[in-house]
């Protein structure tokens, strides 16, 4: 790029500074879409570049200045067919056409423009961002209200457009939209496609937005979500979306609020809406679909937050289903390798969650859970996620349970854990959970120390301790309980300040 072009960018671009979520001291530079478009237009008009070259030069120049262009539409604005309008981006032209057709109450045109709007927004998140900046939400909301008069096809397209627009932009949903969303789901509970799209809107509106979560829960969305799983129990897309939405309701991911209602929402799903029963029953319709089973198991693990909820999973027959699923995965009876590994990880996650109840620990062992967990870790040794979850589940089963520790060791659990440590030396999660498992196995059963040490445990634990800072405490605890020499340091001695006697 010429020196002249560089000077124009550096003098003409209005750059804002926005803090990122990950680096407190670093800042991310951002520009407006108009600034980028002006730079592209200058390249075309003053330097005789073609549209593609002009965009490429603008991108390179702004990025060289550290500008974040993730929310910028990186195409040259187009001139309208008749040349009567200023050049604009496709998404803004579609938005303008949609607004005109909505204002004129022409449903067929509205439908066509909504479809085009969805297609364009799906191609690039920058299109969604630009559309939102230019007033897309009130236009879609008006189309949505127009569709509620009874046009099911237009209603579905309106919900699809809303779900695409709110993906990553949950602040767009206002009080009116929230109320209309709940009303739409209530009135169309029998329609699978409408229910699926509406629930997707709920999920997008609630992700990283605590206020929307609380407002939707108060408006009665939880029974609509569990009811959708019950009513459309054989419709995979509805079940998947409903599970995702239920999980989002239990998240505490909004950094703008000091604390959320995740725990209360999980309790409400279980106690007021029979969430555990609904999810466990739903698994029976998808025993040959590892993708949906993963969603169901992942949601169950988010709800097993209390001692009695863990026991309820067992009482409802959930434990036998989980152990059977794990055995089927180990026997290669379902799906491709990646989907099977994801299902195994989710089954292990829920087993780990419900093993927080001491009575459930024993029930899992009696049901053959330890053998299935060890087999899963051995079968999927190349997956660090499966190894980590396997060690974590066995760790919970061994906690305060010497008899369970014996069964785990005799079943090859210690061997499998050490193999996992060898296979994934750089994975802190695997190393940490394996150290915790070994510690729990020998904490109340010193007889297992020598056999485990003979397998090379000390060297592996020392390696984990030196490689991963997070493993320091658990590694020392494991070495101590194995009978190895560990140098313990006093972090606070009370020798200085007011703590001294």
Curated annotation (Swiss-Prot):
Q: Tell me the domain of life.
A: Eukaryota
Q: Does the keyword Transcription regulation apply?
A: no
Residues where Pros-methylhistidine is found:
263
| Signal sequence coordinates | none
Q: Which residues carry this modification: Phosphoserine?
A: 64
Q: Which InterPro entries match?
A: ARM-like (IPR011989), ARM-type_fold (IPR016024), Armadillo (IPR000225)
Q: Which UniProt keywords apply?
A: Methylation, Phosphoprotein, Repeat
A single Gene Ontology biological process assigned to it is: hematopoietic progenitor cell differentiation
Keyword Membrane applies: no
Q: Spell out the residue ranges that the record assigns to ARM repeats.
A: 220-264, 274-318, 319-369, 370-412
Cite the post-translational modification comment: Methylated at His-263 by METTL9.
Question: Sorted alphabetically, which PROSITE patterns does this protein's record hold?
Answer: ARM_REPEAT
Provide the family line. Belongs to the ARMC6 family.
Name of the protein: Armadillo repeat-containing protein 6
The species this protein belongs to is Pongo abelii
- What is the organism lineage in this UniProt record? Eukaryota, Metazoa, Chordata, Craniata, Vertebrata
């Amino acid at each position: 790029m010429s020196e002249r072009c560089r000077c124009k960018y550096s003098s003409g671009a209005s750059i804002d500074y926005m803090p990122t979520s990950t680096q407190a001291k670093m800042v991310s530079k951002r520009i407006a879409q108009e600034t980028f478009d002006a730079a592209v237009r200058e390249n075309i008009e003053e330097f005789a570049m073609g549209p593609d070259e002009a965009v490429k030069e603008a991108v390179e120049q702004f990025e060289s200045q550290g500008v974040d262009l993730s929310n910028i539409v990186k195409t040259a604005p187009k001139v309208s067919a008749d040349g009567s309008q200023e050049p604009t981006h496709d998404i803004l032209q579609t938005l303008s056409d949609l607004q005109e057709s909505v204002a004129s109450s022409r449903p067929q045109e509205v439908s066509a423009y909504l479809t085009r709007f969805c297609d364009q927004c799906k191609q690039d998140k920058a299109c969604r961002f630009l559309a939102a900046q230019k007033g897309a939400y009130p236009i879609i909301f008006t189309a949505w209200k127009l569709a509620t008069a009874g046009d099911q096809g237009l209603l579905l397209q309106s919900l699809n457009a809303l779900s695409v627009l709110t993906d990553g932009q949950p602040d767009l949903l206002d009080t009116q939209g929230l109320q209309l969303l709940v009303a739409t789901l209530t009135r169309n509970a029998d329609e699978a496609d409408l229910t699926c799209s509406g629930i997707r809107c709920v999920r997008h509106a609630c992700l990283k937005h605590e206020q929307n979560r609380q407002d939707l829960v108060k408006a009665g969305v939880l029974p609509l979500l569990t009811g959708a799983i019950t009513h459309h129990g054989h419709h995979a897309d509805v079940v998947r979306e409903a599970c995702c939405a239920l999980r989002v309701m239990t998240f505490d991911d909004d950094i703008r609020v000091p604390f959320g209602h995740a725990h209360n929402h999980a309790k409400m799903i279980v106690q007021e809406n029979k969430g555990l029963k609904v999810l466990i029953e739903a698994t029976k319709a998808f025993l040959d679909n590892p993708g949906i089973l993963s969603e169901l198991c992942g949601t169950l693990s988010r709800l097993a937050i209390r001692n009695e909820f863990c026991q309820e999973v067992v009482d409802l027959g959930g434990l036998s289903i989980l152990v059977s699923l794990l055995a089927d995965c180990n026997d290669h009876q379902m799906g491709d390798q990646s989907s099977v590994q994801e299902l195994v990880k989710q089954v292990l996650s829920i087993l780990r969650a419900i093993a927080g109840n001491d009575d459930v620990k024993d029930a899992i062992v009696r049901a053959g859970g330890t053998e299935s967990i060890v087999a899963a870790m051995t079968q999927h040794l190349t997956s660090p996620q499966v190894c980590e979850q396997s060690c974590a589940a066995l760790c919970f089963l061994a906690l305060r349970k010497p008899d369970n520790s014996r069964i785990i060791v005799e079943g090859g659990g210690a061997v499998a854990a050490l193999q996992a440590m060898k296979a994934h030396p750089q994975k802190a999660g695997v190393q940490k959970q394996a150290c915790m498992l070994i510690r729990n196995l020998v904490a109340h059963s010193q007889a297992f120390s020598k056999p485990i040490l003979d397998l090379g445990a000390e060297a592996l634990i020392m390696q984990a301790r030196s490689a991963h800072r997070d493993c320091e405490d658990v590694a020392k605890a494991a070495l101590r309980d194995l009978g190895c020499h560990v140098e313990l340091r006093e972090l606070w001695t009370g020798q200085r300040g007011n703590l001294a006697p």
